[in-house]
């Protein structure tokens, strides 16, 4: 991909540094999909509420996406002198090419489209911050990503077109802004809730997998997950949020014995055909940002 004339032609960032952050993105995707048991989601135990995808699809998908993550970082660095609102337009072709490789790797199955959007944004934000020698923390990464997305919800969801996308329909019916709204707001569900929750559990000495599973429950309880709403409507979303909140109120996932509750929750999600894919995407970001 040739860089537009408005971009800096080169970046001062070392290839090793770019590859380090790209590797974290790949590890984040693998960490999420291998985490088990996850209610309604593909994991090492079963395919959740999905009949068209399996664990191996996610492994192949993550590997295909890994090769593109350095491009997002490089573009973020090379566009560092541009107005942040102009960056998203330049990221789109990279994202579309990355999606193409994902679909080729999975024979047409959409495994990680949401993660391409969110990880692409965060990787570009990391590139920009590094290029400008600015403080790189989870908060600054997410606020920089948010600056790329100013006006995104208005442009893409608030429309009166007769042919609505699934996202536009859910916004008009339920007021859910999904991945676009979370990105434009700077990922508050991650920064204000999931990430501090996860880090606190780790500080308390909880097993990292149990801590991640408990954090997933938290995200499921508070996230207006458009993946769930598209499958089960408002009723399905509210049910899933209530069930997750109930498990948290009972103490969450603190011991291996608590996994029985998650297995039952998984069975119920499968019966209802509900998959909290939006919360899974946010869990990927949570783990990724926890490494920074």
From Swiss-Prot:
What is an annotated GO biological process for this record, any one? prosthetic group biosynthetic process
Q: What class of enzyme is it?
A: transferase
Q: Which reaction does it catalyse?
A: 3'-dephospho-CoA + ATP = 2'-(5''-triphospho-alpha-D-ribosyl)-3'-dephospho-CoA + adenine
What Enzyme Commission number does this protein have?
2.4.2.52
Q: Where do the TM regions start and end?
A: none
What GO molecular-function term can you cite, just one? ATP binding
Reported function: Catalyzes the formation of 2-(5''-triphosphoribosyl)-3'-dephosphocoenzyme-A, the precursor of the prosthetic group of the holo-acyl carrier protein (gamma chain) of citrate lyase, from ATP and dephospho-CoA.
Task: Give the matching PANTHER family.
Answer: 2-(5''-TRIPHOSPHORIBOSYL)-3'-DEPHOSPHOCOENZYME-A SYNTHASE, TRIPHOSPHORIBOSYL-DEPHOSPHO-COA SYNTHASE
Q: Which family does it belong to?
A: Belongs to the CitG/MdcB family.
The protein's name is: 2-(5''-triphosphoribosyl)-3'-dephosphocoenzyme-A synthase
